[in-house]
Amino acid sequence: RIASISNTIEGIYAPISDGSDANAILSQMVQSGVNLEIYGNQDWFLGKGFESSPEQSNKLTFDSDYFIDFNDAAFKEFSTFFKNTAGIETNRNILYGYDTAKYILTVIRNIEPTRKNIKYKIESGINVTGFHNNISFDNDRTNKFINVVRFKDGVFELVDKFRSGK
């Protein structure tokens, strides 16, 4: 069905829940002659088989609550320091904790840390730059940042750390 309408649509939204789904979707698109942009969720990070369909793989863009730039100088410095101090490698979960702690410490800086003051400062939309994602809340209580990632020539690359809302 998609092949019959592929010349009238811009792309296809294909979220996955298992890394092996990526290869199945990509190969089916190639076999069916469907040459569309693919939009998905962060589970595409776990995908396998990108190399079997490079032209189609290069059309993949997805959102994610994390993106780690392993080539970033600040990340490399932090990772080395963390390994030397804690004796373990930095991973995604460690970065979630580190970025959250950095956010909380930034929130309570320069205020009397009462519940009310903390709430107001969080709702003010203060932005904190993190290694896995930027963090900013308002009175909706959800992080306003989402990473937009694409797969290009065998590498996942950050397109933007997009901030929604006001």
What do these predicted regions represent?
Residues R1-K166:
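Extracytosolic ligand-binding ectodomains
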